[in-house]
């Protein structure tokens, strides 16, 4: 009898124990924690914006009392997605201008510009998103039609990758661009000895340095619009690849005011002015902003034949591409950054550019371990250069492979294409890959990224057997690349990228299990809820 009484008293004491108060308790979920062992869980508790404990539903319900209880009803939860390379501000600014993405002909481009101007009546017309590779006539356009339609209004239409523009005569006149105009790292495209209006890479600056800069009001509107788009796709951190001081300061002020809630890893544009300022100031780190890297350009893009190759383009004999910055500039900039705590994140697409960047990194980083310098894109890499990624983070964008696969071999030929978009080879070299989209060059959707990485097909299932599937990633590798490995590439793996105790409660609820759903369904997955720091957006 005494034993029974003692047992009842013990049970009563346990039941009377005061539960720990938390803000959120999520139960009955299919949680991919993406921790070191890639454990699954079904519940977790959140307090003060961070994960408190992860485990099973019954145990956590016994231990915690929450202001908000979320019954996930078996839905899948993953860490918030991190886009390791995008143009967040650029996405927002695009919403204020002519959207030319998805156009299938130059006539459609012109029609969109005309419709836009009829509604907006702008003094300067700017658009972005055309790609001649998507047209029946896969050649650069000329500005003749724009000249006739807009004789007095400057028009600049930027190619989807940002590495070429089409400018009408009124815009060319702003920079006094003629057939004799020259600029290192750029090209003024001529036909019959006259400018066509197409300016490639640094030649864009001949016009754009005279173009009106966005106002602070426009920048704020753009950032908030971009945030709305990204949150709907489950992005909780964005790595913006190329920002100036005033733009970073606006981002910081909006975050401090609680208006901009998405977290931003800022790659500072590596201009002399920015280098001087930030190298002197040092790394800037808040919970929402991380300013610790410089974005440098080595070459242009493959689609506009500006990517720098070691041997001429297969479809343009004698042409090697463009070095946007000289090798001397690359080396000098790398030395400056190496003497600081900052990372250097360099755009390199062609095999020549990748070779130069990797060897420069190797030289200046001798005796400086764990600097996590990055190569952005790493699209065409010579076989002997993959080993140089042993200490360099490959920051890659899987949808580039499925967007470029239709014509990439035309550019570089059947031999070089084997070192193209070689994501598995890059993963094997470094042990991690940081995955992004490069939006607005590509679509924002991280589910397109995931699908492109694992299926190596376009949204119509082409090619049937996938594009160079020996370089496909597994679903586990892909999810890591969009979460913990992306966080690692930002020096943020201790605070985000996985669902673990002490980390920011950045997580998303999905309508389908991204790890088991039929691969063809991955692009159609929807985000049910996005949480940043335990707050639903």
Language-model segments: residues:
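Sec-dependent signal peptide recognition
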Residues: 2-7
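C-terminal motif of bacterial Sec signal peptides marking the signal peptidase cleavage site
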Residues: 12-15
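Divalent metal-binding segments
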Residues: 17-27, 32, 36-277, 296-353, ...
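Secondary-structure transition/capping motifs at alpha-helix termini
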Residues: 254-263, 283-287, 340, 362-372, ...
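Non-cysteine beta-strand/loop elements that form the S-adenosyl-L-methionine
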Residues: 288-306, 392-402
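His/Asp/Glu-enriched, well-ordered alpha-helical/loop segment
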Residues: 335-344, 352-373, 377, 383-385, ...
